[in-house]
Design a protein with these regions (language model features):
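Catalytic subdomain that performs nucleotidyl-dependent activation
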Residues: 18, 56, 63-135, 139-142
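Hydrophobic transmembrane alpha-helix bundles
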Residues: 12-26, 50-59, 92-103, 121, ...
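Arginine residue identity/basic-tract feature
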Residues: 2-7, 14, 38-41, 80, ...
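ATP-dependent adenylation/nucleotidyltransferase module used to activate substrates
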Residues: 1-71, 75, 105-113
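Short, basic, helix/turn surface patches
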Residues: 36-47, 85-90, 140-158
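The feature marks non-catalytic terminal segments
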Residues: 116-175
Length: 175
């Protein structure tokens, strides 16, 4: 909040009971990430309605998008990632991700150049290297080291889909 104040930006901090809810709902061995994300999104939707916001901008960058693609592919059996623009299921909210085409390393360099702090994740699970997202993040780092540009290639693939070459019959064109 200090950075926002110093720059004259409005900042709203909302304290929630998400941690308590998660402790009551999840088993000890459960990964909290998807439930936490849904609960936080619910808070954002509610706040957007309260202040009359027409869009909710999230800070997901290209690495987040690619990691989500691989997590869904490997562990959920879905071919989906994070769109740059998403309308909520009820049509009342529009989520935008203006940094979705920016790699994490580029976002960090820009923030540093602008004198903006890099705020680390405050989630206790975030540093757990055994979590699937952390493992996928390491996999991508290794791939990028061995094959520079592979992350950009994966990001490009998300904009260049050939539905007829996938197994989903809903994407097949009838002759």
């Amino acid at each position: 909040t200090r950075t926002c104040r110093e720059r004259g930006w409005e900042c709203i901090v909302r304290h929630t009971t998400i941690n308590e809810t998660m402790e009551n709902v999840l088993d000890v061995d459960d990964t909290p990430c998807s439930l936490c994300g849904r609960l936080r999104r619910g808070v954002l939707y509610k706040m957007a309605g309260e202040i009359g916001a027409t869009k909710i901008a999230l800070g997901h960058h290209a690495d987040d998008c690619i990691e989500t693609l691989l997590l869904n592919l490997f562990f959920e059996g879905n071919l989906k990632a994070m769109p740059a623009k998403l309308t909520s299921d009820n049509g009342q909210h529009v989520v935008i991700r203006p940094l979705v085409y920016v790699l994490e390393v580029e976002a960090r360099a820009y923030a540093k150049e602008c004198g903006l702090p890099i705020v680390p994740c405050s989630c206790p699970a975030c540093g757990d290297l055994s979590l699937q997202r952390q493992r996928v993040k390491r996999l991508l780092l290794d791939l990028e080291r061995e094959h520079p540009g592979v992350k950009n290639s994966m990001l490009s693939a998300l904009k260049n889909v050939t539905g007829s070459h996938l197994l989903d019959v809903r994407l097949q064109r009838e002759p």
